[in-house]
Amino acid sequence: MQFTLHKTAAGESRARRGTVTVNHGEIRTPAFMPVGTYGTVKGMLPRDIEDIGADIILGNTFHLWLRPGTEVIDKFGGLHQFMNWNKPILTDSGGFQVFSLGAMRKITEEGVAFKSPIDGAKVFLSPEKSMQIQYSLNSDIVMQFDECTPYPATYSEAQKSLELSLRWGQRCVDEHKKLGNTNALFGIVQGSMYEDLRRQSMDGLLEIGFDGYAIGGLSVGEPKEEMISVLNYMPELMPADKPRYLMGVGKPEDILEAVRRGVDMFDCVMPTRNARNGHYFVTGNEDNQGIVRIRNSQYREDQGPLDPECDCYCCQNFSRAYLYHLNKCKEMLGAQLATIHNLRYYQRLMQGIRDAIDEDRFDEFVADFYHRRGQDVPPLELK
C-alpha cells in the first residue's frame, strides 16, 4: 500500500487531499466507503456502486465468516470475485460485532468466545483467526482485531481495554506477516474519551507499526461534543504519511468536521439505513439538517426532483411525488432509489471536499455547507 499526500488545505483547518493505492486500485481521499456487510451494499448492484463514484467499499469479517463462510469464498479466490467487485475492499476485523453481542460473549486474553447469532453454536474469534479470515477474503485493507471500548467507560476500564487491544494488535501483525499477506493492515486507536489514554494507545500502535491508523471507539453513544473533543487532537497524533480512518462516523456534518481536523477515510451505514426509512440527504436545507423525509404528506403531489443539484439516477428521473408513493406502498424500488441517491450524495460531498482542497477554497466550501442549512460554521478548537 502507498499513501500519497497531495495537498493540505489553505487556512486554519488540517484538511488533506491524498490517494491511497492498494492492490485493487486507487482511493481518492477524503473518501467515504459504502458498507457492504454481507458482501453486498443493500439494494445496490456492483455497477450501481461504481456509477455513484465509490472507490472502495467495506465488508464485514464477522458476518462473512459465519455466512457463507470462508470455505465458500475461498473457492472463488476471495471476496472480490465472489461479489464481482473489482475495486478496493476494506474489511473490519469483527471486533465491533463481537463486542456488541453483550452477554452472549466472553473475553479472554486469547480472544472472544461467543454464541453464533445465526444458530447459537459456540464460536471463538482471536486476533490470529481474524487475520486468517481477512486473508481468505483478500481484503485490500485489513483491520486489526481490537476490543471496542464501550461508552461510557471508567478510566481503568478504558486503560485495560486499550492495553488488551495493543497486545492483540501485535498478534495481528505477527499473523499477518506469517500468512505472507501483502495487503495493508491498519491499527485502531482506543482509549475512550481520555486524552492521555488515546495518546498511550497511539504510541503503542506506532511502536508495533501499521500501514495506516484508525480512530475507534467513537460514534458509540457519546455526545457529539465529546467526539469533537477527541478529534481536536487525535488526527494530529497520527503519522502524516499514513491514511487516517474514522470508523463508523457518518453524519455529513460530522464527516466535514472530521475532515477539517485531518481525517482521510470514513464509513457508516447511515446513508443506506436512512434510505430504507425514507430519509433522503439533500444539498439544500429542507429541515436545517439537509434531509427530506419523503413520507411527509407535503410531498404527495410534489412534481419537483428530490434534489435539483443532484445528478443521480433517482433525481434525474423521478419526482418527489413518485418517491412518496413508492414509500407509502412499501415498494422495493423506493428503498433502492433512495439508496442510490443517498450514496451519491455522500460521494458528491466527498468530491466537493476534494475539489475544494485542491482549489484552495476549502473554508469557503465549509461556509457554504453550513449556510445552506441556515447554520453558523462551528469553531475549530484544534490542539
From Swiss-Prot:
Region ranges (RNA binding): 248-254, 272-276
Binding site for Zn(2+): 310, 312, 315, 341
Pfam family, one: TGT
Enzyme Commission numbers on file: 2.4.2.29
Note on how the cofactor is bound: Binds 1 zinc ion per subunit.
Pathway the protein takes part in: tRNA modification; tRNA-queuosine biosynthesis
A single BP term in Gene Ontology: queuosine biosynthetic process
Location of the active site: 92, 267
GO CC terms, sorted: cytosol
Classification via SUPFAM superfamilies: tRNA-guanine transglycosylase
GO molecular function terms attached to this record: metal ion binding; tRNA-guanosine(34) queuine transglycosylase activity
Protein keywords: Glycosyltransferase, Metal-binding, Queuosine biosynthesis, Transferase, tRNA processing, Zinc
Catalytic activity line of the entry: 7-aminomethyl-7-carbaguanine + guanosine(34) in tRNA = 7-aminomethyl-7-carbaguanosine(34) in tRNA + guanine
InterPro entries: ArchSynthase1/Queuine_TRR, TGT, TGT-like_sf, tRNA_ribo_trans-like
Binding site for substrate: 92-96, 146, 190, 217
Swiss-Prot/TrEMBL cofactor(s): Zn(2+)
Keyword Transmembrane: no
NCBIfam families, sorted: Q_tRNA_tgt, tgt_general
Reported function: Catalyzes the base-exchange of a guanine (G) residue with the queuine precursor 7-aminomethyl-7-deazaguanine (PreQ1) at position 34 (anticodon wobble position) in tRNAs with GU(N) anticodons (tRNA-Asp, -Asn, -His and -Tyr). Catalysis occurs through a double-displacement mechanism. The nucleophile active site attacks the C1' of nucleotide 34 to detach the guanine base from the RNA, forming a covalent enzyme-RNA intermediate. The proton acceptor active site deprotonates the incoming PreQ1, allowing a nucleophilic attack on the C1' of the ribose to form the product.
Binding partners and assembly: Homodimer. Within each dimer, one monomer is responsible for RNA recognition and catalysis, while the other monomer binds to the replacement base PreQ1.
Family, similarity comment: Belongs to the queuine tRNA-ribosyltransferase family.
Protein's name in the database: Queuine tRNA-ribosyltransferase
Gene: tgt
